[in-house]
Amino acid sequence: MSDIEDLASGGLFDEPKDFYKPEEQPGSDSYARQEKHVAASEYKEPTNFNLRLTAKNPLWGHLLWNAGKVTSDYLDEHSKELVEGKKVIEFGAGAGLPSLLCHAVGAKQVVITDYPDADLLYNLKYNVDQLKKDWDAKNADFSGPSPCADVSSMKVEGFIWGNDASELIEMSGGTGYDLVILSDVVFNHSEHAKLVRSAKELLAPGGKVFVVFTPHRAKLFNEDLDFFRRAKDEAGFESEKLFELKYYPMFEEEEETKELRSMVFGYMLTLKE
């Protein structure tokens, strides 16, 4: 037996058991509208949204966040005022739940943005397409208003906060957007100035910026809140606190911070006329 054959037979060149790790697969989750919101809405369907999530991703598209659910609940409840007939844009959309909800309850236009990562954008487009497929499969005989029968007014775009937003403004017809959604993005403390700048640049006259977040890093809660100071000092936004809701923590970390990490806070930003 040659030396090479001897080494090979001894297992030196055998591949470790975990050498061929299976590729991580996309996940899934779902969201159900609250019955009281459906009952009060002109738009009775869909009542449920099936969402594809990315495989584990450093940009966090693999989770359906509490803030996204709460954002959707609030916009469903207040759709007459905030959504119906409005132009809507979402930053850092992840799976896109709030944007999909806005389309379903009568938004005129919805632009869904996230960091220009191929997996994130593909996943968002998948969820837009799935919204229509789910509608077609379940509601062929539905006679009520049906925005989900046509998703052509929904667009998915890559966007880096603080970068040139002229294309997004052009997509709005040059007017800007009536509602800018920032759902669970203020934990990016280094990006606050860019977030504020882009939100103001894309906002239509009289428009609103809806900010919802959870303090995932409880010890940095004050830095989360600093977003609102910067929004006032750097862009002239006025902030109104709308709610703080007890949910559950997204991550199991320090027991002593569990209470704060369970909270979801909502604010509305407007510019002085």
Swiss-Prot record:
Q: Which organism is it from?
A: Yarrowia lipolytica (strain CLIB 122 / E 150) (Yeast)
Q: By what name is this protein known?
A: Protein N-terminal and lysine N-methyltransferase EFM7
**Main localization, broad class:** cytoplasm
User: Cross-referenced PROSITE patterns, in alphabetical order?
Assistant: SAM_MT_NNT1
Bias class Basic and acidic residues marks the residues at 14-24
**UniProt xrefs under InterPro entries:** EFM7, Methyltransf_16, SAM-dependent_MTases_sf
The record's family statement is:
Belongs to the class I-like SAM-binding methyltransferase superfamily. EFM7 family.
Ranges for the region named Disordered are 1-32
Q: Where does S-adenosyl-L-methionine bind?
A: W65, G92, A93, G94, D114, W161, S183
Keywords, A to Z, come to: Cytoplasm, Methyltransferase, S-adenosyl-L-methionine, Transferase
Function per UniProt: S-adenosyl-L-methionine-dependent protein methyltransferase that trimethylates the N-terminal glycine 'Gly-2' of elongation factor 1-alpha, before also catalyzing the mono- and dimethylation of 'Lys-3'.
Subcellular location field: Cytoplasm
| E.C. number(s) listed in UniProt | 2.1.1.-
Q: Name one GO cellular component term.
A: cytoplasm
Any one GO BP annotation for this protein: methylation
* Gene Ontology molecular function terms on file: N-terminal protein N-methyltransferase activity; protein methyltransferase activity; protein-lysine N-methyltransferase activity
